[in-house]
Amino acid sequence: MKKRIGKRTIRLNNMPTIVAASSIVGPKEGQGPLKDKFDLVISDDLYGEKTWELAESKMVQTALEMSVKKVNKNLEDVDFLFAGDLINQLFPASFAARELGIPFFGIYGACSTMTEGMCLGSMAIDGEYAEYVLCGASSHYCTAERQFRFPLELGNQKPMTAQWTVTGAGSVLLTKEGEGPKIKYIIPGKVIDKGIDDGNNMGAAMAPAAIDTIYSYFDDTKDDPDSFDLIATGDLGKVGKQIVIELLQEKNLDISKVYTDCGLEIFNLEEQDVHCGGSGCGCSATVFASYIYEKLIKKEFNKVMLVSTGALLSPTSTLQKQTIPSVAHGVVIVNE
């Protein structure tokens, strides 16, 4: 069967099964509406380590190990690890990989990293290059603030369009056989830049990339949005979500009945001071590996599209007054 459908969508003939998923979050996330869904809520942001970066590395390592243990496998059984984060040189993911001893592909897609890894891992299994693949992503409020914004000690105020970086790590274990939801389609994202240069308005910067990926899937497959139980973007927040709904409607595509954003699911915007919602690699990673995956396992959801969204700015690009390019990778997951 032909694997490429239209210009962007790839159908996986040997659909990888997501046999396990694991999530770890920080204290603030553990006070949100999904608090009972996570595998572990850590009691403080340092997680017993000396630095926030080491804490983040420990979180993603633990989440990856959890997924392997859940199906009674060993790390030696895993063929590839695709993982990444927001920090320079992928410090958290690389140092976790150092401890795991699995062939490691370090990936950077900003906050799109989770579905980027799932796309690549799925192709590895579909192409019969691997039997077991781990995918993971993490972020940490304190590490991201220090790298991309300001030292926490300054106490800078943020506009209401800003979002709160999730402290969390999520992982999934993919395999060519087994029981569980399967990845049927992947939609690799293009880099889109509509000229937004405000680092405190990431939702507006990333929404065009999500729109491009979601629209490409429906244009390629002629699928019906109402056939989905859920379409979830990664971390567009309140502002970005509304942009996606309105601009897709202008293209005669209405996903509003089944659409949510992981950045709105992980926090209670009325009770927690997170402004526009959650963000970070860990946002879509933890929401998928907890709430969404549980719904798929229980077959309360049978068809889900996850589109993690990433803003590809850097401290250097910001200082050089560049606009913010963004990317969004999509996966369609089904129970069949």
Residue ranges and their predicted role:
Residues 78, 129-130, 228, 301:
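Short, high-confidence coil segments that cap the C-terminus of an alpha-helix
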Residues 18, 52-109, 227-242:
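Conserved beta-ketoacyl condensing-enzyme motif
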